[in-house]
């Protein structure tokens, strides 16, 4: 069981392939990902995720 303790999956770079990124992480044994916001919009997006 692995935890990614600092990820920016809320960044625009992941808009098109977010699900694939998460699935690849799961396939490698990552069970939890902490998404970090760096401004108000990314904080809101982190909460959504």
Curated annotation (Swiss-Prot):
Transmembrane parts of this sequence: none
Named cofactor requirement(s): a divalent metal cation
Residues in coiled coil: none
A GO molecular function held by the record: hydrolase activity, acting on ester bonds
Cofactor note: Binds 2 divalent metal cations per subunit.
Entry EC no(s): 3.1.-.-
PROSITE patterns membership: TATD_1 (PS01137)
Signal peptide: none
Any one GO cellular component localisation term in the record: cytosol
InterPro entries: DNase_TatD-rel_CS (IPR018228), Metal_Hydrolase (IPR032466), TatD-like (IPR001130)
Alphabetical UniProt keywords: Hydrolase
Domain of life of the organism encoding this protein: Bacteria
Family: Belongs to the metallo-dependent hydrolases superfamily. TatD-type hydrolase family.
Protein name: Uncharacterized metal-dependent hydrolase in metS 3'region
Organism from which the protein derives: Geobacillus stearothermophilus
